[in-house]
């Protein structure tokens, strides 16, 4: 049986495209904010259990069994997030941590009932696709960083990063909102966006975790 820690590693691998390509341990270390030796040790355990495969100098990739299990975790997590917002009236920046706790403690039957009562939703509150039939492909994949000054875009997806969600909420920016790309500063690695004449500064790191499409 997988521990919560191992499941979090599997989700991190998938978040870095580890279903179709190899992810370096260094990248995982940065993503999880965990020291490289600890990452290497955990990857070894996951490989021994059959959830990942590794290749020297390339990194780690989910096995078929690992992908199946990871998609199940993500489905649980995203359904829980939606339930917490729609039924229990949580804010979108609050649900990620709650779902992280609950996703490991609910049965398959509970997930089925949750899915049904929510009418089989396509996306979570942050715009992420809810996996179905072992299929997973995010619908919105173009980050804000890829747009140019003057572009007007609609926010479609934001990664589950609590600090980023809190910041966006403080600026009244959410899924479905239109913003204009004002300028980008390569030297400082920040960009400025505007919504309803309110200016918001985003680091490039944050902008890479916000996905949009042209209005």
Say what each PLM segment does:
Residues 103-211:
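Mid-protein regulatory/catalytic core that forms ligand/cofactor-binding pockets
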Residues 58-77:
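Basic, amphipathic "hinge/linker" alpha-helix immediately C-terminal to the N-terminal HTH DNA-binding motif
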Residues 43-44:
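Short, hydrophobic-biased segments on the C-terminal half of alpha helices
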Residues 37, 93:
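Key DNA-contact positions within bacterial/archaeal DNA-binding proteins
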Residues 47-55:
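A short, conserved structural fragment
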Residues 19-27:
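Short acidic, hydrophobic short linear motifs in intrinsically disordered regions
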């Amino acid at each position: 049986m997988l521990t919560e820690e191992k499941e979090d590693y599997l989700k991190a691998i998938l978040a870095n495209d580890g279903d179709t390509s190899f992810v370096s341990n260094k990248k995982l270390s940065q993503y999880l904010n965990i020291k490289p030796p600890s990452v290497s040790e955990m990857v070894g355990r996951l490989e021994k259990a059959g959830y990942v495969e590794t290749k020297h100098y390339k990194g780690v990739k989910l096995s078929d069994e690992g992908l199946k299990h990871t998609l199940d975790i993500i489905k649980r997590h995203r359904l829980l997030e939606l339930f917490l917002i729609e039924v229990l009236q949580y804010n979108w920046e609050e649900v990620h941590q709650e779902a992280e706790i609950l996703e490991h403690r609910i049965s398959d039957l509970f997930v089925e009932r949750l899915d049904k009562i929510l009418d089989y939703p396509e996306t979570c509150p942050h715009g992420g696709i809810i996996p179905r039939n072992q299929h997973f492909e995010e619908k919105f994949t173009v980050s804000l960083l890829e747009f140019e000054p003057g572009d007007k875009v609609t926010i479609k997806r934001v990664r589950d990063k609590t600090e980023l969600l809190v910041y966006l909420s403080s600026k009244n920016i959410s899924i479905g909102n239109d913003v204009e790309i004002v300028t980008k500063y390569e030297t400082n690695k920040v960009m400025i966006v505007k919504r309803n004449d309110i200016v918001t500064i985003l680091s490039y790191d944050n902008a890479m975790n916000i996905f949009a499409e042209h209005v």
